[in-house]
Structures are given as C-alpha cells and as structure tokens.
From Swiss-Prot:
Cofactor(s) for this UniProt protein: Mg(2+); Zn(2+)
Keyword Magnesium: yes
GO biological process: L-histidine biosynthetic process
This protein's UniProt keywords: Amino-acid biosynthesis, Cytoplasm, Histidine biosynthesis, Hydrolase, Magnesium, Metal-binding, Zinc
PANTHER family (UniProt xref): HISTIDINE BIOSYNTHESIS BIFUNCTIONAL PROTEIN (PTHR42945), HISTIDINE BIOSYNTHESIS BIFUNCTIONAL PROTEIN HIS7 (PTHR42945:SF1)
EC number: 3.5.4.19
Organism: Listeria welshimeri serovar 6b (strain ATCC 35897 / DSM 20650 / CCUG 15529 / CIP 8149 / NCTC 11857 / SLCC 5334 / V8)
Binding site for Mg(2+): D72, D74, D76
A GO CC term assigned to this protein in UniProt: cytoplasm
Name used for this protein in its record: Phosphoribosyl-AMP cyclohydrolase
Binding site for Zn(2+): C73, C89, C96
A Pfam family matched in the record: PRA-CH
C-alpha cells in the first residue's frame, strides 16, 4: 500500500474527467478528507477558506464518483479520475480552467 505524504498538512489534488481526461479542478486534501474519499468513493476536500472538510456536490448535487486515485513520484500530490455529475466549477462551468492566458504558435 502506498502512503501519501501529508507531512505538510494538505496535498494538492488534480481532478480529471474519467471519460475524456479533461482537467476539471484543483483542490486540496487533508489526511481526513483523503480517507473519506477512499471510504465513500466520492471526493472530499479540505476548504482552506472555511477551514473545514467539504464533500464535493453535497449541496449542489454536482458529485464526483471516484474511478481511480493516482499519486505522483513523491507521493505528495494526487490525481483523481472521476465521473462528474453536472459542472465541476462553482461558476457553473464544466471545468474550473476556462480562462486562457496564453496560446502558443
């Protein structure tokens, strides 16, 4: 079993759409929210602004059913592939990444 490195408190977590690989959002997980995610099969995060756990979609219904959980080479960043119900972003957009800053040639 791989041990995730929570020594710095929170772990950046990238959420991908399992159907097409699109990046949906970036959030942070505490050890407790990670355990809840593993146990329930739905994403749980730690809100830095509210200083509390939150279950993605609990209020909006826009849930994220976990399909796969990956870790990076240092075990301090997570990538989770999900089946997304509704938009992932609180703005109503499918992805939180919709502001293009620069486009290459």
């Amino acid at each position: 079993m791989i041990t995730i490195d929570f020594s710095k408190g929170l772990v950046p977590t990238i959420i991908l759409d399992d159907h097409n690989g699109e990046v949906l959002m970036l959030a942070y997980m505490s050890e407790e929210s990670y355990q809840k995610t593993v146990e329930t099969g739905y994403t749980w995060f730690f809100s830095r602004s509210r200083n509390e756990l939150w279950n993605k979609g609990a209020t909006s219904g826009h849930t994220q059913k976990v399909k796969q959980i990956w870790t990076d080479c240092d075990n301090d960043t997570l990538l989770i592939r999900v089946n997304q119900t509704g938009p992932a972003c609180h703005t109503g957009k499918k992805s939180c990444f919709f502001h293009l800053i620069k486009e290459g040639d």
